[in-house]
Every structure is written in structure tokens, then in C-alpha cells.
Amino acid sequence: MNTASLSQAEFLRLVRLNPFNAAILERLPDLDVQQGHLVAGALFGTVWNVRSGQPPTAQIRDYDVFYWDDDVSYEAEDAVIRRAQALFGDLNVPIEVRNQARVHLWFNGKFGQDRPPLNSVREGIDQFLVTCTCVGISAHGAVHAPYGLDELASGILRPNPRNHTPGLCAAKIADYTRRWPWLRADGPVINQQRLA
């Protein structure tokens, strides 16, 4: 399978073509959280939109901001969510703010599967369902892409061997290929369990 190449500088340029990404990344340091990152669909979806000739904001369902706080109480996370609403509210797009130290506490209730506690935001990014979607940009502009960016540019969707919930992968890949038909799955896809 041929792959295109994508440098970190070009990735950042493409991501910032989405004005909501640009605004969130500009303001993210002001959220004043540890390990703050803009992650997931806001990033890879923007790249895929640009590569397929769609507007950069097309088909972006929400903008995920991850951070880390050893205080795993709901109240502490809710306080950060409220600060984020004040900081980003004028953008009028759904922004999901989640403390990655808490994921193991709610994951089973949402997805019906247990997962072990994470040790950092980047460990959470490293475990996304599909390897090329394991991307994040820190509050200081550093790109985190443990599998590189070339398969993201090429639209190659591979199940992530580091993910603890592989049964959700088939539904996620089906969703991506429905929204961006030029993408292609590669590697074994496990189970047809539906995402919530």
C-alpha cells in the first residue's frame, strides 16, 4: 500500500485551516491545566477534509480537549469544564473536556468494557482505536503522533494493538469510511460492536 508523507509542520498547517482548531490551540494555554492537548477527530478529521476537498470544519462532530489532574473527582473535572466553557464558549462548537486520569471510572458505563487507568494524556492518545488517529497537539504546540503521520495522510486505517477495547474498532472504521469514503481499512478488524 502506498503512503503519502506528512511532516509535523504540514500537519500543524492543515489543522489550523480549521478556524476552531486554531482558536482552541491559541487559547488552550489559558485553560491552565496539566498536559492540555487538543486531540482526535478535530485534528485528523480536518486533515481528511482538506485532503478530500471538503471545508476544513466539515463532519467534525466535536473538539476534544484532554488534560491530566490527579484529583479524579467529578467536581474537579466539572470545574475545568466550566472554565473551558467560559474560554471557548464564543466558538459555538461542541468542546468535550476530559480529565484522562478519570477515564477508567466512567468508561465501562459508556462503552460496556473495562479499561485500565491511564498514566498520562499521551498514553490515552496512544490507545485510540485506529493508529493513524492517535494524534494530539499540546497547549504549547507540540505534536504527539506515536505512529507517525504518513498513514493519516494516506487514509490507511489500522486497528491499534495498544487499544484495550478492540471490539469497538470495526464500528469506528465504518464511521470514518462513511464520512470519508476514500479512506481504507488495513489489517484485521475485530468484532462489529457498535459505538455509543
Role assignments for model-derived ranges:
Residues 1-196:
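Catalytic cores of the polymerase beta-like nucleotidyltransferase superfamily
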